[in-house]
Amino acid sequence: MAEEEFAELGSDRSLLLVDDDNAFLTRLARAMEKRGFQTEIAETVSAGKAIVQNRAPAYAVIDLRLEDGNGLEVVEALRERRPEARIVVLTGYGAIATAVAAVKMGATDYLSKPADANDITNALLAKGEALPPPPENPMSADRVRWEHIQRVYELCDRNVSETARRLNMHRRTLQRILAKRSPR
């Protein structure tokens, strides 16, 4: 990366990387350091929040689902300490509903895994007008409902009874929906 491209980062080049996939985290940290960032890494929500409390970074790349909780907790903590920070949320589950939640919590952008270092750098450095336009074809109500059911189902560790209780629906109704939409 040329020196003029480093200037685009500004004087504070601190970058927090939070992901529970150690191999991915190590590779990404190395790639981002080559691009001029000064990286700090964390593998859990609690470690990420501790780094934010100690010294809030100018940039952050945070995985949505971590072993000890939701990456949005780190996004929220960083927004409180440093409102102007540029935050990209990564996830293996590219659902529109979670993207909206991440942006509402203060994320600058949302990328699905596997995202390469160039995509992440572009998202971190994108100016407001450079952000992609919203999709032209919004999701159908049925699709939104299915994603919500899937999200609650995963939150309940795939326990049908608990999921049905949280969704206020009969267990057998939920089982039929899951059976109908599940891949065969």
UniProtKB/Swiss-Prot annotation:
Pfam families: Response_reg. Keywords: Activator, DNA-binding, Phosphoprotein, Transcription, Transcription regulation, Two-component regulatory system. SUPFAM superfamilies: CheY-like. The modification 4-aspartylphosphate is found at D63. CDD domains: REC_RegA-like. SMART domains: REC (SM00448). Coiled coil: none annotated. Phosphorylated by RegB. GO terms for molecular function: DNA binding; phosphorelay response regulator activity. Residues 14-128 form the Response regulatory domain. InterPro entries: ActR_PrrA_rreg, Bact_response_regulator, CheY-like_superfamily, Sig_transdc_resp-reg_receiver. PANTHER family: PROTEIN PILG (PTHR44591:SF14), STRESS RESPONSE REGULATOR PROTEIN 1 (PTHR44591). Member of the two-component regulatory system RegB/RegA. Involved in transactivating anaerobic expression of the photosynthetic apparatus. It is a transcriptional regulator that is responsible for activating expression of the puf, puh, and puc operons in response to a decrease in oxygen tension. This is Photosynthetic apparatus regulatory protein RegA. The lineage of its organism: Bacteria, Pseudomonadati, Pseudomonadota, Alphaproteobacteria, Rhodobacterales. The gene is regA.
